From Swiss-Prot:
Record's GO cellular component terms: cytosol
Pathway: Purine metabolism; IMP biosynthesis via de novo pathway; 5-amino-1-(5-phospho-D-ribosyl)imidazole-4-carboxamide from 5-amino-1-(5-phospho-D-ribosyl)imidazole-4-carboxylate: step 1/2
An annotated Gene Ontology molecular function: ATP binding
Enzyme class: ligase
Gene Ontology BP, a term: 'de novo' IMP biosynthetic process
InterPro entries, sorted: SAICAR_synt/ADE2_N, SAICAR_synt_PurC, SAICAR_synth, SAICAR_synthetase, SAICAR_synthetase_CS
Gene for this chain: purC
Reaction catalysed by this enzyme: 5-amino-1-(5-phospho-D-ribosyl)imidazole-4-carboxylate + L-aspartate + ATP = (2S)-2-[5-amino-1-(5-phospho-beta-D-ribosyl)imidazole-4-carboxamido]succinate + ADP + phosphate + 2 H(+)
ATP-binding as UniProt keyword: yes
Protein name listed in UniProt: Phosphoribosylaminoimidazole-succinocarboxamide synthase
Enzyme Commission code(s) on record: 6.3.2.6
Assigned protein family: Belongs to the SAICAR synthetase family.
Keywords: ATP-binding, Ligase, Nucleotide-binding, Purine biosynthesis
């Protein structure tokens, strides 16, 4: 499958059309961003790690009955995926307090959240991805009630699967974001799941093993990503 035209260039991936109108190529770059894209750096191997990590996770979710856009890996940095009509709202599941939740509510980082929280954010970098709710989605027509209910159910199901997967690897799945779209009328998980869009802590030391290492200038970003992949059994080489 060959890349044709560049359809979209995001902060860390480029999307290309193919000769099949129903399929796209996701190309993972070495770019790493923070502050809604205001700070960008490149890290060797990052595109490869995230591409293979994403394929591994999507395969696990598919096996658990969660429909994803993943078709197959094409190369170290490219994957073939279904073309989705993306929903402009992203879902966040929080198992422990971290990030914006800590700032917003003034609670302690790491506080367990039971049951896990489900948040919605409008995908808009210029507006810093404002938090919204189901009422906003209905009023502004971003997504139907039926599809949003499916997105919520699939997010919680993904949390069950992935929390156990990471726990078995000695990691805590603190929180993560998911993006969904429609494929021939069906709600399907799209975009990616990687340490770029999730928080992962070592279960024993609580060391951060995700993009917070870049956001907080902790160093060792790729080493942490590769360690997570190694523990999960993601084939990198």
């Amino acid at each position: 499958m060959q890349k044709l035209a560049e359809l979209y260039r995001g902060k860390a991936k480029t999307v290309y059309t193919t000769e099949d109108p129903d399929l796209l190529i996701l190309s993972f770059r070495n770019d790493t961003s923070a502050l809604d894209g205001q700070r960008i750096e490149q890290f060797d191997r990052k595109g490869m790690v995230n591409n293979k990590f994403n394929h591994f996770i999507m395969s696990k979710l598919e096996a658990a009955g969660i429909p994803t856009q993943m078709e197959r890996l094409l190369s170290d940095t490219d994957a073939l995926v279904k073309k989705l009509e993306m929903v402009p709202v992203e879902c966040v599941i929080r198992n422990r307090a971290a990030g914006s939740l800590v700032k917003r509510l003034g609670i302690e980082e790491g506080m367990p959240l039971n049951p896990p929280l489900f948040d919605l954010f409008l995908k808009n970098d210029a507006m810093h991805d404002p938090m919204v709710n189901e009422s906003y989605c209905r009023t502004f027509g971003w997504v139907s009630d039926e599809h949003l209910a499916q997105m919520k159910a699939l997010s919680y199901r993904a949390n069950e699967v992935l929390s156990q997967l990471f726990d078995d690897a000695g990691l805590i799945l603190v929180d993560f974001k998911l993006e969904f779209g429609l494929y021939k009328g069906q709600v399907v998980l799209g975009d990616e799941f990687s340490p770029d869009g999730s928080r992962l802590w070592d279960k024993t030391t609580l060391a951060k093993m995700d993009k917070d290492r870049f956001r907080q200038n902790l160093g060792g970003l790729i080493e942490a990503y590769e360690e997570v992949a190694l523990r999960l059994g993601v084939p990198l080489d």
